[in-house]
UniProtKB/Swiss-Prot annotation:
Function: Is involved in generating a small heat-stable compound (Nod), an acylated oligomer of N-acetylglucosamine, that stimulates mitosis in various plant protoplasts.
Record-marked site positions (Raises pKa of active site His): D148
InterPro entries associated with the record: Glyco_hydro/deAcase_b/a-brl (IPR011330), NODB_dom (IPR002509), Nodulat_NodB (IPR026402), Polysacc_deacetylase_ArnD (IPR050248)
Name of the protein in question: Chitooligosaccharide deacetylase
Gene Ontology terms: biological process: carbohydrate metabolic process
Record keyword Cell division present: no
């Protein structure tokens, strides 16, 4: 199936001369009171930054987690207010989803510099891209997706990420779950596989000569 022309505006990786050996860890669907602190602990242990694509409704519930991740050197990005499929939304609703999430983030942590947007489910449309540009946000997709949300096993998550690791790779992981899976979001062990895999992925990337950064 041919990729729509407008999708060329959504980067799936990031490379530049100065960041030729960088890999970017990103986390969607948080903040979550069980998972996000554990993810932050692993990142702190290995002294690497990441970018967290936060859902605005969760940010309002757990502003302290946004303040913590910013204080620890991570970036917060926009993952909309309620995580809808934006392809089913009219342009006004798309704008509202992005604007309300942005306001929730900066209200939780005025120091947060929100520079990126990731569409829920990775579903991009021309309306979404236009709204992203008007909001001053760079659209970001991914190049490495181990589908950790499906709990495929720690080895699968690690192997998929390492197989896709190359200069500029953007890795998609999760520190929560969408609001329509709210019952799972209350499970303390929701992202245990992601957590264990992350503790293996980071040193493995370093051993391959990659530097891990948050999105530029």
């Amino acid at each position: 199936m041919k990729r729509p022309a407008y999708m060329s505006e959504v980067p799936v990786n990031h490379t530049s001369g100065q960041e030729a050996r960088c890999v970017y860890l990103t986390f969607d669907d948080g903040p979550n009171p069980f998972c996000t602190p554990q993810i932050l602990d692993v990142l702190a242990e290995h002294r690497v930054p990441a970018t967290f694509f936060a859902i605005g409704s969760y940010v309002k519930d757990h502003p302290e987690l946004i303040r913590r991740l910013v204080a620890e050197g991570h970036d917060v990005a926009n993952h909309t207010m309620t995580h809808p499929d934006l392809a089913t939304c009219d342009p006004k609703d798309v704008k509202r989803e992005i604007d309300e999430a942005h306001q929730a983030i900066v209200s939780a942590c005025p120091q947060a510099l929100v520079r990126h947007l990731r569409a829920p489910y990775g579903v991009w449309t021309e309306d979404v891209l236009s709204a992203s540009v008007r909001a001053g946000l760079g659209a970001v997709h991914w190049s490495a997706d181990p589908r950790d949300w499906s709990c495929p096993g720690v080895d699968v998550i690690v192997d998929e990420v390492l197989a896709a690791a190359r200069p500029g790779a953007i890795v998609l992981l999760h520190d929560g779950c969408p609001p329509d899976e709210v019952e799972q979001c209350s499970l303390a062990g929701l992202r245990d596989q992601t957590l264990i895999a992350l503790s293996r992925i980071i040193p493995a990337l370093h051993s391959r000569g990659f530097e891990i950064r948050s999105l530029p």
